[in-house]
Amino acid sequence: NIITIPEDAETNQWTENHWNGGGVYIINGTGAGQFRRIRSHTLTKIELDQPFLVQPDATSEISVTTVRHHLYFINNEAVDVGAYQLYGSVQNCVISGMTMTRCNGIVGRGSLLYRGKQPEWYIDIVNCRLKEGNYSHWFGIDDRGHSGHQSINLIGSGGTGMSIGTVIRRNVLSEYSYIRTSPGANPDAVTDVIIEDNSFDIAKNAVLLGGNATNTSGVLIHNNRYN
């Protein structure tokens, strides 16, 4: 369960055992999409709590960052607010039964944040309702371009593999609410997404896949209803 850190690795706040309990994420290359917790580490070696199922190799890109996982947000409501946002490193989480009215929407943000690549993997956004989809962000005061239509938005910026394995299912989106991806310039920044059994009522774009053909990849859009 030991991995060796390359001599040319880019590090930040990397002192012995400072990141115990944190996570080692394979974000690209062989073994991508796996993470393990750190049991202990020196400046050159990391001991994991358990081995990877697929071992990393010289093609693998690894990020060491915080672990936030197994979180459940059930049957909450928001009116006239900003985003209900998963910000940075989050894994194996569920947002279910959320009702939003005139908000920025539900945002899953896997990004390069505070000098660390913080991926967002294996999120379920299900059984939510987004209604009255016009959103005004400090309109007329300091909008900063944030006003627009309410959305379920998957962000993957700052590298490959920032957003992997999100399921968006059985949501009701009305009055210009919609689903979108917002990848950065890297290939597979947002990947392996299921958009299924959702209902749309009045939308400029029901589903908008951002970037080019490789920035957002591996998307299944199935059995949605459009009015």
Whereabouts are the PLM-identified features?
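Extracellular beta-strand/beta-solenoid scaffold signature
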Residues: 61-63, 77-87, 102-120, 134-160, ...
